[in-house]
Amino acid sequence: MPENPSPLPAARSKRPLVIGAAAAVALIGLAGFFGLARLKRPAGDAACTAAVEVAKKIAPLAHGEVAAVTMASAPLRLPDLAFEDGDGKPRKLSDWRGKTVLLNLWATWCVPCRKEMPALDELQGKLGGKDFEVVAVNIDTRDPDKPKNFLKEARLNRLAYFTDQKAKSFQDLKNVGRALGMPTSVLLDAQGCELGTIAGPAEWASEDAIKLIKAAMKPATAGF
């Protein structure tokens, strides 16, 4: 008698049916998955159309030290991220409406983040004011004093301290495809619309970055 007998004819005939049924279920599952993925894509915001035009105009300035910035190609208003200031008071991203904003998410466990912070601090010192703000949100989920101590020891005193100990800001940006790694920075116009995004560090105090941000601060109708 053979060691591995062939399946009985009836069983053999059922195997393709089982495989076919499994394949059908898999295809249905994939269709559902991709359907959900499409639903999760940001629908866009018609009010942010002007920001896309600005992004197109200033795109040639995204070179050199800021070459990794991806300029906006579709209208997107960022979620109204919620976090706290250094005194524990609740803040929202919309608090800065009326200003051009460089939103930055950072953490002390992120080496590129720590290296980038001095440049962000310098940028705030150079351009920060009534028309522009660096909003750097720390997303450490443990030891709330650690990021404060880091800023103090590094003598970075021009950046205001903001924290999101649940790291929900990162998840909210991830949900709209704008948080792929750390650090993450998003350049926003005065209406909270995306102008450009970068996953990774940049020399934000460089001449290249200053020129890009100054151009972003101009009205949408201005020439560049």
Positions of predicted regions on the chain:
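Alpha/beta-hydrolase fold active-site loops
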Residues: 100-101, 132, 183
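Thiol/disulfide oxidoreductase modules built on the thioredoxin-like
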Residues: 153-158, 164-215
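Extracytoplasmic
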Residues: 76-78, 96-98, 129, 156, ...
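Structural microenvironment flanking redox-active thiols in thiol-disulfide oxidoreductases
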Residues: 114-155, 165-173, 211, 224
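Short, low-complexity, Pro/Ser/Thr/Gly-rich segments in the mature regions of secreted, periplasmic
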Residues: 214-223
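N-terminal targeting signals for export/organelle localization
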Residues: 1-77, 222-224
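Conserved redox-active cysteine motifs that mediate thiol-disulfide chemistry
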Residues: 97, 105-122
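A short beta-strand-turn-helix
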Residues: 70-75, 80-101
